[in-house]
Swiss-Prot record:
Name recorded for this polypeptide: L-arabinose isomerase
Cofactor note: Binds 1 Mn(2+) ion per subunit.
One Gene Ontology CC term in the entry: cytosol
EC primary class: isomerase
Cofactor(s), by name: Mn(2+)
Oligomeric form and interacting partners: Homohexamer.
Organism of origin: Enterobacter sp. (strain 638)
Enzyme Commission number(s) from the entry: 5.3.1.4
Reaction(s) the record says it catalyses: beta-L-arabinopyranose = L-ribulose
SUPFAM superfamilies attached to this UniProt entry: FucI/AraA C-terminal domain-like (SSF50443), FucI/AraA N-terminal and middle domains (SSF53743)
GO-annotated biological processes: L-arabinose catabolic process to xylulose 5-phosphate
Matching InterPro entries: Ara_Isoase_C, AraA_central, AraA_N, AraA_N_sf, Fuc/Ara_isomerase_C, Fucose_isomerase_N/cen_sf, Lara_isomerase
Amino acid sequence: MTIFNNYEVWFVIGSQHLYGPEALRQVTQHAEHVVNALNAEAKLPCKLVLKPLGTTPDEITHICRDANYDDKCAGMVVWLHTFSPAKMWINGLTILNKPLLQFHTQFNASLPWDSIDMDFMNLNQTAHGGREFGFIGARMRQQHAVVTGHWQDSQAQKRIGSWMRQAVSKQDTRHLKVVRFGDNMREVAVTDGDKVAAQIKFGFSVNTWAVGDLVQVVNEISDGDVSALVDEYESSYRLTAAAQIKGDKRQNVLDAARIELGMKRFLEQGGFHAFTTTFEDLHGLKQLPGLAVQRLMQQGYGFAGEGDWKTAALLRIMKVMSTGLQGGTSFMEDYTYHFENGNDLVLGSHMLEVCPSIAVEEKPILDVQYLGIGGKADPARLIFNTRTGPAINASLIDLGDRFRLLVNCVDTVETPHSLPKLPVANALWKAQPDLPTASEAWIVAGGAHHTVFSHSLDLNDMRQFAELHDIELTVIDNDTRLPAFKDALRWNEVYYGSKR
């Protein structure tokens, strides 16, 4: 995806006319230097665009209004270079509906001990200008992030880049369309929910299309297009004997390719970037979409099984956040456990649909095997193990009066034994702080059995996401203790209840 090329982040300097034109000229020069350097050296995902100084209430309000109506503007970074009386910002911040970050920095890294005078002090007032801005944000209950550090500091730059990813993701989510092919898996609770509340809170829309509508598009795909895609399969994957030319399951591979092309065409024509399927509603499809879903996820689409639109949307959101980062992000499900004293493990997988972006560095196997669920022909799928290292599992649930985001930090490990009879992609991990604590906390908090699994993102990314969307965050990591965790759930119930 090249989604970051579609957006920019505005860089606004707060000041005032009290200090005279020469001071404002220097402020402008400093701002130009900082923005140019950050764009050139900081490896930011988005371009920073310097806007005119904000020195009066009208100027600031004009900038904020323009930001709202500029589709390319993903958010605004504010630097209080000098003292900028915060009452000047009230009208602008009242109408601003784009993400906001205060960069609490200054032009110089060190103090000029021998030459510092009051002119220098008046020009470089971030230390208390930023506090004035922070007060009005707190007074207005304005959600905003703060990053402190010198503009040349790599950690400060990294944090700004991380926030930019959140800002772009939020803008993308406002336009996100999720299509459900068929309805929710029958009688399942956690995959259901309030789609209207979700659209109000996050911006994405969720609607259902009959599987027959998809089948019609699938059937329109030409044999030539199918053949070209299968050639791509041949070069990208290790095909088993059954899946190769003259193999007894070769037709299943061709059918899977036709389904992939049809699904992608349907998604593109409808402007959808996330989707769900359900094995209970496959009328007209020759097989449960497995390979198609895996490859579409790798291209940046959100997906979840059994009609789980919340997880599908969350996967798309996290795919956008993690664009260009190392690792991968996938639909996942806690499937089964390995209980061993001191070495409890979780084997994660799904019937078919795990994204190859999390695979180890080798070509996945493309195979066709029996699937008892769904009642269709044997589906094609990619089989692989997952990279090792730190990861997260995230789940978005609907509690009726609010949305809760659960995040469990995990450590992905190598599979200690081969799995010769398991014909699906999988991941093996240790849950933090341990499996009993993590699973009990997850269950008590209502976490779903479907998750988004990511090597690319971490807890800080999801914390920013929750803050930006003003939703509850529940964390399970090495610091989690069940009594305190349960207390936090009770406190959250009171806090969010008071906000209704």
